[in-house]
Structure formats: structure tokens, C-alpha cells
Amino acid sequence: MNYFRPLYPFLLGWALILNTTSFANLSLVNGLGQLILFSAVVCIPIWRTGRMSYVDIGWPWGLVLLGIVSFFLSDGYWLRSLVVSIVLILVGLRMGLGALKMWQMGLLKKEFPRYQYQRIRWEKEGKTNVALALQVDAISQGLANASFLAIPIFIIASNNSPEFLVLEIIGLVIWLLAFAMETVADLQKIAFLQQMKKAGKQRQVCNVGLWRYCRHPNYFAEWMVWN
């Protein structure tokens, strides 16, 4: 059983960027930073607790790191680099601060359902060394930030043109609308949960605001953010 197979595409992607003349320095700094971040924030806690949920802290803060690195080390037009960095940092902070809040509330002491399902998948694949599979999955998340997620960021941030294309402006507008939508959806759900808690009600369906029209408006908006 090859436990390390999930890492191969990301390692290949990172190696390809490292071998480019334009992005080698960016990729090296970002990749090493991601590995250090994930080792401290994700891999060690997973090793100590056996729970995968710490990925929800490491991955968004990896986006923040990617945004900072791309701004300070890219050779593109400063305003374009700044815009790209701000977009990444805001996306990362939204999820990263939320994850820290969940950790503070003790919610990470229980494995999230999606990670419980991951264990079922491993069992079906014949993977019996769960501790190793957890570490490989966690590292793959950090390598994603170092490879395929970083490629479009580096390309855009390294564009020297001082003029913004119409397509870039359209993309920024879509991002602003989507980011606002998922923020509003999150706030509406938090308010709903607080109201249900005060009323002593449990397992209620959120059907207020944007949640009236879509089962997961925050997920839909998050998908649009990455478009």
C-alpha cells in the first residue's frame, strides 16, 4: 500500500515551479514556509491527538502566508500584486480566524464529519496505518498551497503591466460580491444558532436570509470566490 501516492502530484507541481526562472525564489520561500507552518500547526497536533480537524487552521493561514510572500517577492506591478495579496489574505483570515475561534471553543476536540468520512475511505482502500495516512493528508494540504494554488497567484502577481485588463476587473468584482455573500451568510447562520440556543432548540434548519434560498449559500459563495 503506497501511502505517499497523494503527495506525488503536489511534489511534481512544486518541483516544476522551482525549476522556472521566474518563480524559483517565490516558490522556494513559499514552499518552505508552508511546510514549516503545517508542521507546527497541523502535523504535530494531529500526531498528538489523532484528529485531522487541525487542517482547518493550517490551510487558511497558509493562504495568508502565500499572499504575503507573493506581494513582497513578486516582480510584477505593485498595485496588481497588492490586490492579489489582499484577496488571498482576506480569504485566509476569514477562515483562519474562524478556525481559531472553533479551537478556542473546544470544537476541534471532536473530529469533523468530513474527516470521519476520510477514515472510511482509507479503510475501503485497505489503509490500516491511520496515523501515517493522517500525516500524508495533512502535508498534501500544505503542498497544495505550495504548488497548484500558488501557480496562478505567482503568474498574476508577476505581471508588470500597469494597466488592468477588463477580465481582471470582472474577476475582482465577482470576488468582492462572492466574499460579501459568504460573509453575510456566515453572520446570518451565527445569529440563527445563537437565537436557537437561547430558545433551547436543537437541530433546527437555518432558513433565514440567504439560507432561505440556498441550502449552503456560504459554500456556493466560497466556490465563486475561487472563480
Question: Can you annotate each of these PLM segments?
Answer:
Residues 1-215, 220-227:
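Membrane-anchoring alpha-helices and their flanking helix-loop junctions
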